[in-house]
Regions:
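Signature for phosphate-centric chemistry
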Residues: 1-87, 93-268, 274-290
């Protein structure tokens, strides 16, 4: 069971990035201090709306390369599990970056000719409500999880915003007031959050990013914890629906184990949701006040 490989920002996150960068550009001022690199910096894709949501294709951390190399590593470890003459099914949710991840993985594991030689077949599972309780994307088909504003999917964003408000205002003040960048105007929590996001996304594409040097170690620790918060309350132990959705995967795995070797020796499932995949979890609470 795996998510997709490394990707560009989603359209929602990318839109935030571009909006921030356009606002700073429109201010038409020379930036100082930590943000001075923006005077000569360009976004990490020339075709953002084409690349958003898709696998990264360049740099040492390219998603296409990562998926292929994962297939190669699996082959070196688990080739003995392959059954000669038996076609392996690879399940992928209906998202292009997931489908591409599965295809690159298959090329690394089964060889570049995996489709022509019928060594494996890629089965794409739609992310639609008529699929009901499938094991790949239950978060997209559980209505109560989607519609429950207090305890469902959106609770992760609520708790994230609460924690962002504890650590981001000080960063915004440092970048504007202390570093003499007042002319760009106040930075919102989401704008600073977008800056922190761009460190990782640019690193995936270019191998490094000047955004990473903008923030202190403590500020990065807060960002990492904030990422834990959103997943904890959106799809982890802090969400009352997580166990039910994770049970689908657990039940399917249990059924395969009971069936024994006759059911097959290799099973590959790749998924995409806006969260981490819902798996059975042990209760745990982030050690901080939100």
């Amino acid at each position: 069971m795996s998510r997709h490989a490394e990707r560009y920002p989603t359209k929602n996150a990318g839109a935030r990035h571009l909006s921030l960068l356009n606002r700073i550009r429109d201010a038409n001022v020379v930036l100082n201090g930590s943000l001075s690199f923006l005077n000569n910096w360009t976004y990490f894709t020339d075709e953002p709306w084409k690349d958003f949501d898709q696998l990264t294709r360049t740099g040492p951390y390219a998603g296409t390369l990562q998926a292929f190399m994962t297939g190669v590593r699996f082959l070196t470890r688990y080739e003995h599990l392959l059954q000669p003459g038996r076609r392996t099914r690879i399940w992928a949710s209906d998202s292009q970056r997931v489908i591409d991840t599965a295809a690159y993985f298959a090329s690394g594991f089964f060889g570049l000719d995996w489709e022509k030689t019928d060594k494996a077949v890629l089965e794409v599972i739609p992310e639609t409500f008529d699929r009901h309780a499938d094991t790949l994307t239950p978060g997209d088909t559980c209505l109560r999880y989607i519609e429950d504003a207090d305890n469902g999917h959106d609770n992760g964003y609520t708790m994230l915003a609460r924690f962002q408000n504890k650590y981001i205002p000080d960063i915004a003040a440092r970048l504007t007031l202390k570093e003499q960048n007042e002319e760009i105007g106040p930075l919102t929590n989401l704008e600073v959050w977008s800056m922190q996001e761009m460190c990782g996304f640019e690193t995936l594409v270019r191998g490094s990013s000047p955004w990473c040097s903008v923030f202190t170690q403590k500020e990065w620790e807060s960002f990492a914890y904030a990422r834990d918060v959103i997943h904890y309350y959106r799809a982890g132990p802090g969400n009352p629906y997580a166990g039910a959705m994770g049970w689908l995967w657990l039940n399917a795995t249990t059924a395969l184990l009971h069936a024994g070797p006759e059911a097959g020796t290799t099973f590959f499932s790749l998924s995409v949701t806006l969260t981490v995949m819902q798996l059975p979890v042990i209760p745990w609470t982030p050690k901080s006040t939100i």
